[in-house]
Each structure stands twice: as C-alpha cells, then as structure tokens.
C-alpha cells in the first residue's frame, strides 16, 4: 500500500490558484496546509482569496499561513491586470471565511519540514506563486531539505517565451533571487 505524503500548497491567490485549489479538493488531494505569498495580488488579498476558496470548496478546516509580502531584493509587482483588483476577477464572496492559522508561513515551513525529517518522512510542496516563502525558509534553515519531498513548481519557461516579459515567467520574475535559491537547492524539483 502506497502512502500519500502530506502536501503544502504555496500560492499567490489569483484566479489560476483558485482553480488549482478547487481541482485539488475535487480530486481528493486537498492540501494539508496552505502558505500564502504576494504575487498576482498583494499578500492580504491573496490570503483572503485562498480562505474564500476553501470556504466555497467546503474545506474551511485547512490551515492557511500568511507568508512573504514582498520579494527578497526588488520592488513588488502584481498581475492585477489579469486577475482583477481583488485577484478573483470580482467574483462574489461568502459572508464569512475562515481565519488564518498564523502570520508566519516561513516558520511553519521550517517547523513542518524539520519535523518530517526527524520522523523519517517527507512533505511535498506545490508552489504556484513566487518562491519567496520557501527561499526564506531555506536561507534560515538549510537542513529543511531533508524533510522536503517532491517540489512541484508552476514557474519558468521552456523555449524562452515568457508571460511577463518576452523571456520571463511571472512567478520567477516576481522574485528572481528567491527562484535562484530554490532552483539551486538539492531538491527533487518538477516544473509543471
């Protein structure tokens, strides 16, 4: 019998992220936790959007940890021109949404991956926003790599065609220093 590893979703809360989260829920692969990051919209809007999707998707029990509000070394950019001012294209929202579990996604990632490593386990992570949360965690505690299973990333380009500039994909472009930290870490990375 194959055991499914725990899954963390790291997301910047845009329309594509909402769809991805709903697809995970529908497929029976609801993340065990979500960490939020700036990107498509600011951190507060991204967090609110993911809490909204969890409420609408019938999974308000999933803990959400608020993460990085800005890139490591450059000004913040967003993709409101695609996702709308609120990040969900103005979609209606429920009257109540769950609360965040914490305001420190980086500490949550460090604690989770170190605990997994000490138990001889690994936790998978699906990153569909800028890589800042994981980069900060790796910078603060490099030993977390022992507890990270498969890292699946929505980022980068294949054939050199970007969606933000002629050669840059948004999630990498939003924080290239964070992307470099993650891509050079000794991890099992899948770019999807």
Identify the role of each PLM range.
Residues 65-93:
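Surface-exposed loop and adjacent secondary-structure segments within mature catalytic domains
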Residues 2-11, 15-52, 92-192:
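Active-site histidine-anchored catalytic micro-motif
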Residues 53, 57-65:
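A glycine-rich helix N-cap at a beta->alpha junction
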């Amino acid at each position: 019998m194959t055991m499914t590893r725990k899954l963390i979703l790291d997301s910047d809360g845009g329309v594509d992220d909402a769809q991805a989260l709903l697809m995970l829920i529908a497929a029976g692969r609801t993340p065990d936790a979500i960490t939020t990051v700036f990107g498509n919209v600011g951190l507060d809007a991204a967090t609110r959007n993911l809490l909204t999707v969890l409420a609408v998707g019938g999974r308000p029990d999933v803990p959400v940890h608020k993460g990085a509000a800005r890139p490591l070394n450059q000004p913040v950019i967003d993709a409101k021109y695609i996702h709308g001012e609120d990040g969900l294209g103005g979609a209606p929202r429920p009257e109540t949404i769950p609360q965040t579990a914490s305001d420190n996604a980086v500490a949550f990632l460090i604690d989770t991956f170190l605990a997994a490593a000490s138990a001889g386990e690994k936790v998978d992570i699906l990153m569909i926003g800028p890589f800042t949360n994981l980069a900060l965690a790796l910078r603060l505690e490099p030993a977390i790599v022992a507890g990270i299973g498969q890292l699946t990333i929505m980022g980068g380009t294949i054939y050199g065609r970007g969606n933000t500039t002629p050669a840059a994909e948004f999630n990498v472009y939003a924080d290239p220093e964070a992307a470099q930290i993650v891509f050079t870490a000794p991890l099992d990375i899948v770019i999807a």
